[in-house]
Amino acid sequence: MAKINDNYLKLKAGYLFPEIGRRVRAFAEANPQANVIRLGIGDVTRPLPPAILKAFHDAVDDLAKVETFAGYGPEQGYDWLINSVIEKSYNKLGVELKTSEIFVSDGSKCDCANILDIFAMDNVVAIGDPVYPVYNDTNVMIGRTGEADDRGYYKGIVYMPCTEANGFIPTLPTEKVDIIYLCFPNNPTGTVASREELKKWVDYAIANNAVIFFDAAYEAFITDPAIPHSIYEIEGAKKCAIEFRSFSKTAGFTGVRCGLVVVPEEVMGSTATGEAYSFNKLWLRRTTTKFNGASYPVQRAAAAVYTDEGWAQTKEIIDYYMENARIIREGLAEAGCTVYGGVNAPYIWLKTPGGMSSWEFFDKLLTECNVVGTPGSGFGPSGEGFFRLSAFGNRENVIEAVERIKKNLK
C-alpha cells in the first residue's frame, strides 16, 4: 500500500476558511430565510475594471488568429509584463530591479508555499502570531515541524506574538532564525510597519544570514505616504529579502489568478558544504521545472493594470474598498468596540466585547446579526479574543452589516 505524507495529519482540524464555510452552510440550511452578509474571507466583489477586461478580451481574440496565437510562454513571465511591473511598481519607489529577478505566477498563495522548495529542511523558521495560515501550515506539510502543543504552536517553529502591547508588530527573535515571514500591511491585523521597524528586520537578517519572506499582497491599500510599499525601499533588503505580490486584491484577480515573486540575485544561501549559492538561480530552476507560466490572457490583463487608464480604474476600486473599511472601523468604534487596522489595509481587527472568545463572537454575529467574519483565533493563539472583518463586500451590505452589529452590541 502506498504511504501517505503523515505530516498532513499534524494539521489542526480543517483549514480556517473551509471551517467557516461549513458553519455558515449549516446555519443557512437551518435558517433559509436569513439574509447572511459575508465579511469573512477576503474575496473581492467588484467586477474587473473596463480597461483590464478589454485587455482580457483582446488577448482571447489573439488566440483565435494564426498571426497572434500564443502557446507556451516564458515560464518566468512575459517581458512586457515584467518591465511594466518594474517601471510602475518599483522604479517609482526608487527601487531598481532586473527582469531576471521577477517571476510572474498564478497567485501569491501558491508562491508563499512553493518557495519552501528551495530551502533546506533544517532551516529555523520564524512566523508571526496571529498569521495568515498558509505560512504555518505549509511548513507543517513539508515536515519542518513536530506536533502542535495545547496552544497550537508547532515544535520547530519560532512564533512571534503580535499583541496589543507591541502594536501587533512582532519583536526580533531572541534566538537565531534562518527564515522570517513578514506581512505588511498585515493580514489579519491590518497594521503596517514603518521604515524604522523594517530596517530592524533587514539588519537582523543580514547579521544572521537569514532570509525575509515579505508578503506585500496589500501594499496598494496603503494611504500613508510615510509607510513603505516594498521591503526593497529599505537599504540592504535586496541582500536578504524575497517579496511576494498579488493582483488578487489590488485588481480583483481572485478568480483570475496572477501574482509575482521578486528574488534578487543578491540573496544568497549556503550549500551543505558551506558554499554560497543564489536563491534566484534555484527559484528559476524550480519554476522552469514545475510551472509553465501564467496564461497569456491573464498576463495581458495584468499588464493592463499598469496603463494610465487601467490604474485609474483600479485605484477607484481600491478607494471603494477603503471607504468600506472606514465605514466598518468607525461604525464599530461607535458601538464601543476597540478596533485596529482599516486605515492602510482592507482588514479591521476588533477586540471581542465582554471577554468573549473569537468563536463565541463568530457564533453571536452569525446567529444574532446574520453577519460572517473571521475568528481571530483561527490565525493563531495570539488572535484569541479578536475578530477580523473584511472591507471587500459591496457598499450596501457593508452598511447593513455595520448597522446590525451596532444595534446588537448597544
From Swiss-Prot:
Pathway: Amino-acid biosynthesis; L-lysine biosynthesis via DAP pathway; LL-2,6-diaminopimelate from (S)-tetrahydrodipicolinate (aminotransferase route): step 1/1
Alphabetical list of Gene3D superfamilies matching this protein: Aspartate Aminotransferase, domain 1 (3.90.1150.10), Type I PLP-dependent aspartate aminotransferase-like (Major domain) (3.40.640.10)
Function field: Involved in the synthesis of meso-diaminopimelate (m-DAP or DL-DAP), required for both lysine and peptidoglycan biosynthesis. Catalyzes the direct conversion of tetrahydrodipicolinate to LL-diaminopimelate.
Cofactor: pyridoxal 5'-phosphate
InterPro entries hit by this protein: Aminotransferase_I/II_large, DapL/ALD1, PyrdxlP-dep_Trfase, PyrdxlP-dep_Trfase_major, PyrdxlP-dep_Trfase_small
Species, as recorded: Pelobacter propionicus (strain DSM 2379 / NBRC 103807 / OttBd1)
Binding sites annotated in the UniProt record for pyridoxal 5'-phosphate: 72, 108-109, 132, 187, 218, 246-248, 257, 292
Molecular functions per Gene Ontology: L,L-diaminopimelate aminotransferase activity; pyridoxal phosphate binding
CDD domains, sorted: AAT_like (cd00609)
Family: Belongs to the class-I pyridoxal-phosphate-dependent aminotransferase family. LL-diaminopimelate aminotransferase subfamily.
Subunit organization: Homodimer.
Keyword hit for Protein transport: no
Protein name in UniProt: LL-diaminopimelate aminotransferase
Key words, A-Z: Aminotransferase, Pyridoxal phosphate, Transferase
Record-listed substrate binding positions: 15, 42, 109, 132, 187, 292, 388
Catalytic reaction annotation: (2S,6S)-2,6-diaminopimelate + 2-oxoglutarate = (S)-2,3,4,5-tetrahydrodipicolinate + L-glutamate + H2O + H(+)
UniProt keyword Transferase present: yes
One GO BP: lysine biosynthetic process via diaminopimelate
Top EC class of this enzyme: transferase
PANTHER family, A to Z: AMINOTRANSFERASE
Chain positions found as N6-(pyridoxal phosphate)lysine: 249
